[in-house]
Amino acid sequence: MVNVPKTRRTFCKKCGKHQPHKVTQYKKGKDSLYAQGRRRYDRKQSGYGGQTKPIFRKKAKTTKKIVLRLECVEPNCRSKRMLAIKRCKHFELGGDKKRKGQVIQF
């Protein structure tokens, strides 16, 4: 279980100094229907002849690498950058911090 705080003080390239950053998890955007590869694929698929390209079935990994999106909280900066961290099964953003010697309650 990886628990990352929602804010982090780190270097901002635009400001040129350490600033607090808002941390969110990166999500992939929706694929464009008009990208060259997509247009080519749709053209090839149309008409008779079934599936024209191989469908990938050999999945090797069980996890994805976590990518954090850091946004500077300075009002006139707001620059964003990505930061990749290691692979993990469970990822949590801004969860409760673990305490030493604390009694677990259910």
Curated annotation (Swiss-Prot):
The keyword Disulfide bond does not apply. It holds the Pfam family Ribosomal_L44. GO terms for biological process: translation. Keywords: Cytoplasm, Methylation, Ribonucleoprotein, Ribosomal protein. It is found in: Cytoplasm. The modification N6-methyllysine is found at K53. Residues 26-53 are annotated as: Disordered. PROSITE patterns: RIBOSOMAL_L44E (PS01172). Ubiquitously expressed. It comes from the Eukaryota. InterPro entries: Ribosomal_eL44 (IPR000552), Ribosomal_LSU_eL42 (IPR053708), Ribosomal_zn-bd (IPR011332). GO terms for molecular function: structural constituent of ribosome. GO terms for cellular component: cytosol; cytosolic large ribosomal subunit; endoplasmic reticulum; nucleus; plasma membrane. Belongs to the eukaryotic ribosomal protein eL42 family. This gene has no introns in its coding regions, and therefore, was most likely produced by retrotransposition of the original X-linked gene during evolution. This is Ribosomal protein eL42-like. It comes from Homo sapiens (Human).
